[in-house]
Amino acid sequence: MSIMPVKNALAQGRTLLMGRMPAVKFSTRMQLRNRTAVLWNRKFSTRLFVQQRRSSGEIVDRAKAAAANSGRKQVSMKWVVLTSFTIVLGTILLVSRNDSTEEDATEGKKGRRTRKIKIFNNNWLFFCYSTLPLNAMSRLWGQVNSLTLPIWVRPWGYRLYSFLFGVNLDEMEDPDLTHYANLSEFFYRNIKPGTRPVAQGEDVIASPSDGKILQVGIINSETGEIEQVKGMTYSIKEFLGTHSHPLMSKSASSLDLTSDEEKHREFARVNRIQLAGSEDTEQPLLNFKNEGDQSVREFKPSVSKNIHLLSQLSLNYFSNGFSCSEPHDTELFFAVIYLAPGDYHHFHSPVDWVCKVRRHFPGDLFSVAPYFQRNFPNLFVLNERVALLGSWKYGFFSMTPVGATNVGSIKLNFDQEFVTNSKSDKHLEPHTCYQAVYENASKILGGMPLVKGEEMGGFELGSTVVLCFEAPTEFKFDVRVGDKVKMGQKLGIIGKNDLK
């Protein structure tokens, strides 16, 4: 046995080994193992990447949700705090008002206590409504209405308004809608002569305006209360600022309605307002502003008109000085007429009478719509109003246009300097009655003669007219509450009526 060199033996062993091992299978197994490892690594790394992406997205979403919830919680907390503060403040106000009942009450005649006027009775709706700047809003609305409209807009806009509020365009004196430069001119439009026939008869009272009858009746001669709606009244003394007794203790044809100390004191007592110079300074002062004679020369009546009114008023006149006797068998009646936005906005004289005094009571401009009249106590006493006082053949007669929201102006044809709801300082002093007379219009009659059907003035948009007049007990109304009337239509008659 020969010994093989080491080098040759190693070479031979390598050859034998390579011959016995399947080289292809070995390489394949190595490739499969490597591929499996790669795929495993890829699968693992992809899943991890997806998980990482998902986890990062969830973190972002959770952060956004947390921020949104935090914002909602902050907003909710703000509303909770605001609501709680409002409730607490309102409770304090209500409690303080209830606790001050004795302070609000004043001692009247016969030991009877009366309470001051309140604009709400534990009603949040009217309380919030009463805090709105309605006078400023009405002035702004008046400025908007006075803006000149493009000619092409006018027919479309006015027809739309007429459709919404039931305006009868066929009655217009000037049917060309392009001639009305703005809404104010369209609101204050004139109607054709003869469109509103006036009820004739010396004992007939005609409607002073278009509108809806809200209330008619008799004024309580003991308390002087006027029924605003069923179960809700206001005082004629607070409404007109007249003497203590509703019938004024003497016929209106001889009433001296000009300013005098006794009347001022009575008016201050009725309205629970202290006169200047009094020792008690807790109550607001009453200032009577006498504006003198405001007669307009252009409206000076003719001789025939004076004679006609003298003949109508002769029942209460005799001898020189035009003194008169006490009225007998008479009562005070009232009628309330609401003018809707679509109505004819001018008001006319309902009877032959003499307007002697104009009293302007600046006030608020709450809405006088029927809903507010049913639910808002003392609405007419709180609102701005112009009381026109005088006399007719049966005694006292008054006609009072009452302002309302978005009614920026009450116009009087025979008092052109008179302006209501003005931003100027002319009529802005609180607790002040601005009074004027019309003696120079007729020296004989002592006031402005007005015949039935004569135009006196008007509103811009719509409002309310209140009539308070003295008449024989035989007077009967010819209309019912809720009836719609036209200017000149018969409201009532002394004697028989046609109401069934």
UniProtKB/Swiss-Prot annotation:
Induction note: Repressed by inositol.
Subcellular location, principal: other
Assigned GO CC terms: endoplasmic reticulum membrane; lipid droplet; mitochondrial inner membrane; mitochondrion
Residue ranges crossing the lipid bilayer per the database entry: 80-98
Reaction catalyzed: a 1,2-diacyl-sn-glycero-3-phospho-L-serine + H(+) = a 1,2-diacyl-sn-glycero-3-phosphoethanolamine + CO2
Swiss-Prot/TrEMBL site (Cleavage (non-hydrolytic)) positions: G462, S463
Annotated protein name in UniProt: Phosphatidylserine decarboxylase proenzyme 1, mitochondrial
Organism for this UniProt entry: Saccharomyces cerevisiae (strain ATCC 204508 / S288c) (Baker's yeast)
Record lineage: Eukaryota, Fungi, Dikarya, Ascomycota, Saccharomycotina
